[in-house]
C-alpha cells in the first residue's frame, strides 16, 4: 500500500521522489520487514530513490542497540540519491540513554565516520547538512561543508562507488 501511494505521488508530480530513513526511538514489534528490506522493496515496487540520513542511522543504532555500520553497508547503493548529515542531542531526562535527532548540534565524529564509510562504498552523492537550531558562526557551518566535500573528494580519488552491487 505504501509503494502504491509513493507511485501515486510520483505520477502526480511527474518525477521520482526520495524516501528518507527515519530515526527510531523505540522498538516496534510485529513488523514483516526490517527497515532496509522495507526500503529496498519500496524502491523496487515504486521506482523511488532513497535519501539516507546518516545521523538517523546513528541515533537509531544507539537508541535500539544495533550496528550502525551494518545498516550503512546494507542500503542499496544504486537507489541512494541524496545523503543528509545532522547533529543530535541527548534527551534532557534520559541523557545519553536516548539520543534525539535535533539538528541543533555539530555533526558527531561517529556520524562523520559513517558518512565516510557510506561514500567510500557508493561514491559521492548530493549531501545536505541540516542545522535547524543553535546556529553557530558561519565559519563552523562552512567547516562542516568543507569536511563533507573533503570526504567526497577523497573517496572519489580512491575510486569509491565503482564496484557495482550483486543483483
Residue ranges and their predicted role:
Residues 138-164:
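C-terminal helical cap(s) of enzyme catalytic domains, especially alpha/beta-barrels
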Residues 61-122:
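Gly/Pro-rich active-site loop or hairpin
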Residues 2-10, 36-43, 72, 112-119, ...:
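Generic structural signal for well-ordered alpha-helices
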Residues 21-31, 56-59, 97-104:
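Surface-exposed cleft-lining segments at the edges of enzyme active sites
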Residues 22-24, 55-59, 85-90, 132-134:
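Active-site beta-loop-alpha junctions enriched in small/polar residues
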Residues 17, 53, 83, 127:
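Conserved, mostly hydrophobic/aromatic
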Residues 28-44, 60-73, 139-142:
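Distinct, well-ordered alpha-helical segments
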Residues 1-49:
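Active-site acidic/histidine proton-transfer and metal-coordination neighborhood
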